[in-house]
């Protein structure tokens, strides 16, 4: 954020519904339509006209649908670890990670252990205070992830959603940058290349 600000950009990090510090949807509605609607409302409220949208995973999918289905205009789109074609095994691993300890973790040490098991390549922090931003303290005194558990049953990943992403990608004419984490098991190199074949004007960083 500081780097973008120094370059003259006005950067806003959006916590989508059910994520981070945003409220959870009382009706448990986390479909693509609602996500796109929320995004459009925020952009309208900011009065920023045509923004540059940067999204990772779900945020990238929301941005792709919003732009590709002509729901809003943007100056450019940056998608991180997300494309119409993703790896089922990688997505299943995320689901498994999300579904563990549904009643919460007893301590930040347990949270750190769960993250270390999910991302063994990352160095485990000595100071666990920073993990507090990833969890919230529930009424039962346990730590739960900073997302609504109802999302576990409404995560977009069905074939019809993937087909929707494919169709949206066909309509992209604005500048696009696809970023893939080198160790990503969700977006493979093949998945990235498939998107580049579909959107040949896009730039790519691995």
Predicted regions and their residues:
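Structural signature of beta-strand start/N-cap positions in the alpha/beta core
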Residues: 10, 49-52, 73-76, 175-177, ...
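Active-site loop/oxyanion-hole signature of alpha/beta-hydrolase fold enzymes
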Residues: 2-6, 10-54
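Conserved serine/cysteine hydrolase catalytic core
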Residues: 137-198, 203
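Conserved dinucleotide-binding and phosphotransfer motif residues
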Residues: 7, 70, 198
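Conserved hydrolase catalytic core segment
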Residues: 45-90
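Active-site loop signature of alpha/beta-hydrolase-fold enzymes
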Residues: 19-22, 85, 186
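The conserved SAM/SAH-binding core of class I Rossmann-like methyltransferase domains
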Residues: 12-14, 56, 80, 179, ...
């Amino acid at each position: 954020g500081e780097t973008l600000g120094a370059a003259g950009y006005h950067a806003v990090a959006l916590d989508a519904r059910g994520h981070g510090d945003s409220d959870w949807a009382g009706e448990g509605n986390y479909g693509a339509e609602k996500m796109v609607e929320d995004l459009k409302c925020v952009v309208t409220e900011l009065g920023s006209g045509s923004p540059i949208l940067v999204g990772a995973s779900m945020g990238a999918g929301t941005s792709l649908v919003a732009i590709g289905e002509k729901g809003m205009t943007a100056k450019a789109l940056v998608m991180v670890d997300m494309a119409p074609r993703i790896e089922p095994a990688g997505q299943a691993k995320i689901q498994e990670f999300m579904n563990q300890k549904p009643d919460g973790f007893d301590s930040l040490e347990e949270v750190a252990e769960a993250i270390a098991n999910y991302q063994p390549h990352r160095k485990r922090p000595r100071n666990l205070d920073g993990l507090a931003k990833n969890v919230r303290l529930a009424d039962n005194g346990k730590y739960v992830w900073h997302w609504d558990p109802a999302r576990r049953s409404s995560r977009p990943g069905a074939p019809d959603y993937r087909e929707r992403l494919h169709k949206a990608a066909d309509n992209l004419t604005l500048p696009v940058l696809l970023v893939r984490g080198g160790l990503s098991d969700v977006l493979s190199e093949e998945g990235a290349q498939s998107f580049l074949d579909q959107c040949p004007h896009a730039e790519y960083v691995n």
